[in-house]
Amino acid sequence: MVLEVGMGGALDSTNVIDMPEVAVITNIGLEHTEFLGNTLEEIAMTKGGIIKKGCDVVCYNSAPEVVSIIRQLSAVWDAKFHLVDFDSVTPVSHDLSGETFEWSGLTCNVPLLGDYQLHNAATALTAISALRDRGWAIPDDAVVTGLSKTRWPARFEVLGREPLFLLDGGHNPQCAEVVAENLTKYLGDEKLVFLTGVLSDKDYKAMIASVLPHAEQFLCVTPDSPRALDALDLRDYLRGLGCSADAYEDIPSAVHAALLTGKPVLAFGSLYMAGDVRSSYYKEKKTAQRKYCMNSRRMLTPEQRIEFSAELSKNLTKLPEVQNATHIFSYMAMQDEVDLSVFHDWAEQNGKVLSYPISMQNGHMEAYTLGEEPVWNYGKYGIREPNPDFSELRAPEDFDVILVPCVGFDEDGGRIGHGAGYYDRYIDRAPDACRVCIAFEAQKLEKVVEEDTDMPMDYVVTEAKVYTF
């Protein structure tokens, strides 16, 4: 178990562990001074309260006075002290996908941006080494995989690339300086549109000063906090500096305006706006991608749809999971979707049990197997659905394979549906089923805008190819 301290250490609610294996002290700055103390030494003493007798202590190599305090506390508690050696990780390359480095003969990648992420990685790896010394079996492949799957939302996070859209929740001058350094490192002299909101009790003037050389214009919003600086006041301050600045009534409007510029965007200034920025961005981009894919599908002629649907059905029958399946969750096509009639004929001839969805009023759907004499209804979306009075309800765990229609997909297994989330919610109830996305090749995108609630696919089957993940 890994416990992250909320604030400080000695008096934090997480500090109830009698004998931790490793206590990790990360970088310490002058934050929460009203609770933790006004100097680095005072804060270090509070942070060091998580050190217990006989544990290992991993200390981020920060200010000398901090390191000295943590070293002394480790000695008091007879705890083995490890000072993180930042040179233990050797940078190899960096781009907007993350940082690649070498450590102890391994080539590792973290999908996080900024030089300080290498320092954070070195800290984590030092903790791993300490655990190994204490007898923990942590294989190299687990280290490499764990680093590659690390996520840190709203820390110079790339939400999208067309145009580039960055999100950073930094809310103090120190964070702003790091943001400015990262902009120089990754984008050079390129100017950005800043979507900015700040809290009135933060030193926002110093924050603005750090990023000003990188700004082409500012779109000002009011974060969701009683301490927020009103967007109009922020706009007026920026205009007083000679900046191009406009105020927006809400965050969705500002995100929409930022994307319309077609220029790189950085949403920045407060964690209180990060969640709204993320959701608004995904909604905007998914709407655009959904429209593009539906238009692409609509451009197919009726003859092409029939031909491609038949070819796709043949590809589908070749999947081992489909050939070995007993229960298959399928669907009836709507509008211009892939028609699986050819596949349904094959499935029935080969003894497969087919079930079809019914959309329920509560935002969920259920699957029903038709009776010997099929009786259909037309659902609220105009799709043919089994009549539940003449069909058998199937539990999600019954299914070996679930066929999932889509609006768009990418080569990494990303999928865009119609936006209601019916399939994502159902798939979550059937964790052992093979998930197969069904689409025409014309519906392929370079990269789907994904959200945390989007369920990954095992295959995407088109008339031209089977994509495996």
PLM regions: where:
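N-terminal active-site beta-alpha-beta segment that forms phosphate/nucleotide-binding
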Residues: F194, K202-Y204, K285-E397
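Short internal beta-strands
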Residues: D56-N61, F194-T196, E216-D224, K352-I358, ...
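Residue-level signal for inorganic ion chemistry
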Residues: V2, T26, I43, S74, ...
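Conserved phosphate- and dinucleotide-binding cores of soluble alpha/beta proteins
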Residues: Y368-F469
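Nucleotide phosphate-binding/pyrophosphate-handling subdomain across enzymes
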Residues: M1-L3, D12-V24, I28-G29, E42, ...
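Acidic, Mg2+-coordinating active-site environments of NTP-dependent enzymes
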Residues: M1-E4, P20, I25-S104, A121, ...
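A short, well-structured juxtamembrane/interface segment
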Residues: R151-R155, C175-V179, I251-P252, R305-V322
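C-terminal helical cap/extension that packs against the catalytic core
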Residues: A63-H82, S97, L164-F165, I208-P264
